[in-house]
């Protein structure tokens, strides 16, 4: 059976949790392959229960599904324990969660440096979540990071923390005028936390490849979105990892030839959290309408999301860089009750039309959207379960997005619930 990659095709917050939940009963494994608790997935179960997940894969809410936090994820031990406790308090079985031995741990000094750096930068800040994600990835690349397996050997953990703080305390004290951290206190804190998760540490690469050999289906669940990718996103306003499909193989330990489907998640309009370019951003009543109807508040940060019309330029770009085979279009219902629904089909930069993503950072910042107006619809579409049950104008809108994006729209979300979905083509096939 296949490995399926699920990725956000915009700037994150597209509705990836809903897609994972819908596929849940057809899956045996769900894997987070990058990012950390700087992103969130919201899942609404058929009984109306709502769960916000930050580190743990969305498959944890489906009985009998095995879940993996992969080697490409950076893990805050305290956040992991808090999230596990919250799920268990609500009756969720968390026994099927494994943590890669090679996943890097977010240490207290990562969070301290992240927060103080953003304050220091002021108006020039990137807009991070302040959760230590970037500094942890910096240590990973610099080969001085702490991995999950290190908590199983106190001597190694102590050596790594002491070496890290020898430099980082200089930064905190001499550059940012903050207090130094005590290495032994950091070690003791992490070892105490490790008591709650060390039994989950595993060679997850081996587990996943054995699962594929047995014919089981594995979903590789990305966080954030294509335009936040450190290589392919709107740099420097990006995250510190690779949410794109290429990062799925690296962050899970599954070979790329095992991947048969790349499912992109597209919101029927566009949103973004934090700083950075956003060509279709709205500052009028339409923007306020989308924000209100769509409940556009960040799951992790609580920050209001910026809103705009659908951007086909970035959708085409996402299709290309990810090799997307199928799209799941979410929140189509939010667009009900609009007379017209504009679609950005190209950009204008300094009087020149760009049908594809501009190459330079300056051009994307100065891009002006070129819109195509589509007739809207006023009907409530939340009860539609087949494509033909949608109003004709809604059907036309979906088909136009499909044409502009360059990949088949296999599923359409018409509400937040698992069952509020139209399936035009099965994803697991």
UniProtKB/Swiss-Prot annotation:
Describe the function of this protein. Plays an important role in the de novo pathway of purine nucleotide biosynthesis. Catalyzes the first committed step in the biosynthesis of AMP from IMP.
Could you name the Gene Ontology cellular component terms for this entry? cytoplasm
- Designated name of the protein: Adenylosuccinate synthetase
According to the record, cofactor stoichiometry and binding are noted as:
Binds 1 Mg(2+) ion per subunit.
Give the domain of life.
Answer: Bacteria
SMART domains associated with the record: Adenylsucc_synt
UniProt KW Ligase keyword: yes
Q: Name the enzyme group at the top EC level.
A: ligase
Q: Which source organism does the UniProt entry give? A: Rhodococcus erythropolis (strain PR4 / NBRC 100887)
Residues annotated as binding substrate: 299-305
